[in-house]
From Swiss-Prot:
This is UDP-glycosyltransferase 76C1. Involved in the N-glucosylation of cytokinins. Catalyzes the formation of both the 7-N and the 9-N-glucosides. It comes from Arabidopsis thaliana. The gene is UGT76C1. Keywords: Glycosyltransferase, Transferase. It holds the Pfam family UDPGT. UDP-alpha-D-glucose binds at residues 279, 338-340, 355-363, 377-380. Its EC number is 2.4.1.-. It comes from the Eukaryota.
Length: 464
């Protein structure tokens, strides 16, 4: 790691692909502004330190068993991580603060701690050392504000939703519709632990020194303007992180299949549908086959990411009908993981069938690639509503996954005039968002304000 005798920032990501990527992107941005970077991380889903030689990486124990790391119950994983990591995190931070001639940190004052909002113990730990703590919001900010209202919405008895009200807007959570609530709020069995967790996040965020948002005013103007209804701390919308003028590097937990790019090179401009449902979502076998048949029936070229184990009860794609790949006549390619930024930036990519995670949504907007929305959980339903109904840069697939609906959406986007209209709108949005990170843009100015704020070094309390 390059020697820097300056201000040090401690970053602590949640060990999920959708959280690690933004945190490492933020690290590169802050490094470019003169800060030394130390990443504290768990053993579970540890980032590859060799991909980031300019940063210091410190691993702490997380106490997860092998079966717990494989669990599909994300709330359970987050609860266990918060229970298990508080003491190891405190011990690691204490070692960084306490001067040590052999640690190499004695001449680097710690400016602050930055961690994901899902860590609910870090505020109290930071306060015990007199360290400022900033919360990273890696969601669209309107969702971040709105999801704290989930317990209230539940208490008000929105569920079950009568059929006559299914398409009504949720007043507290626009542009979400009432029919989205049952999927975003979980089952009744999950309600108590989920509501308790959300309240802990809110309680741990309110006293923080600020919130760093992976969005920009161009995408989150209304919610940013209303943030003072919930928070009295500064908000710094400095996204999208990945298009800031900093060197690119890999932060994927999965190895991307680089053969995607030469395959795309052989395709015509804007002729390929890229399909990926992210790093967490999974499908039952029936839905997987409906997507497969729908894509085949379009007669359009497609590049499809199917993570190993993401189809319930299957290792990979062995449930495809016999002769499926041969029937595509070379128009389809299925990989275990893809270099998504490179794929979306490729001239051959004309559409993105996506789960609408916020990382993927931002990446698609920034490359001007229109979307077909197939949200699976949580914030993805909010993102899909903005894409299809507010910005109108995509098509929302609602209801059950059916091959005819997949086929119809792909044809509309890739062949019909509707797709050209959508493409024109996303190009305008792309240009607005990209301008935000340039000098004088809204995110650039917010980054200047953030750097000024965390440059004020408060002397930490040295543990005895």
């Amino acid at each position: 790691m390059e020697k820097r005798n300056e201000r040090q920032v401690i970053l602590f990501p949640l060990p999920l692909q959708g959280c690690i990527n933004p945190m490492l992107q933020l690290a590169k941005i802050l490094y470019s502004r003169g800060f030394s970077i130390t990443i504290i991380h768990t053993r579970f889903n540890a980032p590859k330190s060799s991909d980031h030689p300019l940063f210091t990486f410190l691993q702490i124990r997380d106490g997860l068993s092998e079966s717990q790391t494989q669990s599909r119950d994300l709330l359970l994983q987050l609860t266990l991580l918060n229970n298990n990591c508080q003491i190891p995190f405190r011990e690691c931070l204490a070692k960084l603060i306490k001067p040590s001639s052999d640690s190499g940190t004695e001449d680097r004052k710690i400016s602050c701690v930055i961690d994901d909002s899902g860590w609910v113990f870090t505020q109290s730990v930071a306060e015990s050392f007199n360290l400022p703590r900033f919360v990273l919001c890696a969601y669209k900010f309107s969702f971040f504000l709105g999801h704290f209202l989930v317990p209230q919405i539940r208490r008000e008895g929105f569920l079950p939703v009568p059929d006559s009200e299914a398409d009504d807007l949720v007043p507290e959570f626009p542009p979400l519709r009432k029919k989205d609530l049952s999927r975003i709020m979980g089952t009744s069995a999950q309600s108590k632990p989920l509501d308790a967790y959300l309240l802990k996040i809110l309680d741990a965020t309110k006293p923080a020194s600020g919130i760093i948002v992976m969005s920009c005013k161009e995408l989150d103007h209304d919610s940013l303007a209303e943030s003072n209804k919930v928070f009295s701390i500064p908000i710094f919308p400095i996204g999208p992180f990945h298009i800031h003028d900093v060197p690119a590097s890999s932060s994927s937990l999965l190895e991307p299949d680089q053969s995607c790019i030469p395959w795309l090179d052989m395709r015509e401009t804007r002729s390929v549908v890229y399909v990926s449902l992210g790093s967490i979502a999974s499908l039952n076998e029936s839905d997987f086959l409906e997507i497969a048949c729908g894509l085949r029936n379009t007669n359009q070229s497609f590049l499809w990411v199917v993570r190993p184990g993401s189809v319930h009860g299957r290792d990979w794609i062995e449930s495809l009908p016999s002769g499926f790949m041969e029937s595509l006549d070379g128009k389809g390619k299925i990989v275990r993981w893809a270099p998504q930024l490179d794929v979306l930036a490729h001239r051959a990519t004309g559409g993105f069938l996506t789960h609408n995670g916020w990382n993927s949504t931002l990446e698609s907007i920034c490359e001007g690639v229109p979307m077909i929305c197939l949200p699976c959980k949580w914030d993805q339903f909010v993102n899909a509503r903005f894409i299809s109904e507010v910005w109108r840069v995509g098509i929302h697939l609602e209801g059950r996954i059916e091959r005819r609906e997949i086929e119809r959406a792909v044809i509309r986007l890739m062949v019909e005039s509707k797709g050209e209209e959508i493409r024109g709108r996303i190009k305008v949005l792309r240009d607005e968002v990209r301008r935000s990170v340039k000098q004088g843009g809204s995110s650039y100015r917010s980054l200047d304000e953030l750097v000024d704020r965390i440059s004020i070094i408060i002397e930490p309390l040295v543990p005895t």
